From Swiss-Prot:
Subcellular location per the Swiss-Prot or TrEMBL entry: Golgi apparatus; Endoplasmic reticulum; Perikaryon; Cell projection, Dendrite
Required for interaction with VCP: region residues: 168-258
Pfam families in the cross-refs: SEP, UBX
Keyword Endoplasmic reticulum: yes
Cysteine disulfide partners in this protein: none
Start and end residues of each stretch annotated as Required for inhibition of CHRNA3 ubiquitination and translocation of CHRNA3 to the plasma membrane resulting in an increase in acetylcholine-gated nicotinic acetylcholine receptor currents: 1-165
Post-translational modification: Ubiquitinated.
Name of the protein: UBX domain-containing protein 2A
Subunit note: Part of a complex composed of STUB1/CHIP, VCP/p97, CHRNA3, and UBXN2A that modulates the ubiquitination and endoplasmic reticulum-associated degradation (ERAD) of CHRNA3. Within the complex UBXN2A acts as a scaffold protein required for the interaction of CHRNA3 with VCP/p97, this interaction also inhibits CHRNA3 ubiquitination by STUB1/CHIP and subsequently ERAD. Interacts (via SEP domain) with CHRNA3 and interacts (via UBX domain) with VCP/P97; these interactions are required for the interaction of CHRNA3 with the STUB1-VCP-UBXN2A complex.
Biased composition (Basic and acidic residues): 1-14
Amino acid sequence: MKEVDNLDSIKEEWACETGPPDSQPLNDNQQKDCEYFVDSLFEEAGKAGAKCLSPTEQKKQVDVNIKLWKNGFTVNDDFRSYSDGASQQFLNSIKKGELPSELWGIFDKEEVDVKVEDKKNEVCMSTKPVFQPFSGQGHRLGSATPRIVSKAKSVEVDNKSTLSAVSLNNLEPITRIQIWLANGERTVQRFNVSHRVSHIKDFIEKYQGSQRSPPFALATALPFLRFLDETLTLEEADLKNAVIIQRLQKTAEPFRKL
């Protein structure tokens, strides 16, 4: 497997046709390239230490289901294009037998198993908008065993009747932001890339309503813990399809003079 130096070379190597589920079928050469990529991904992941677990071997865990289709791939039924930069980095990590940095930002307290299914001869016909973990047999990625803070129910913003929707401009690029709250709850919200980090903070405050938390800051764990400048736009802060973590700010009484 040749080494990938940049995104352009990744696009050349991943010759699978990408796009929405109703895109045109692949020609013979494109299909062969797609099959080669999917097969090599399994091979490289195996060399890096990925293994298939039987149901009796598995422990309590959070699993992620990845399906590789003709026209793209899905992560727990969330459709993604092969040509997208974030998707390329995600799959390149899988190919190396590593847990993608995106998942490190989501799961930091629980073991994660990844199931990769080969569906390169099929076209993905339906998608779901929200990434959610699943339970099932999977390929464990070597040493990647992050933990999740608490078992939290996935909640979409549409389920909050008191939540004010974020105003979107459909003429501008839109991205989904996964938000992990300090209480363990998680939600997904769409923003324009021109929105600022402060808009995410405003959204969280409205989302929490009367149960508003103490003062907090926003951070991302990709590729390392980084606190965010609230004045930056999502595009400037490189937060497209990112995971944002609510970090409570500790408050303490001033030292008393003796």
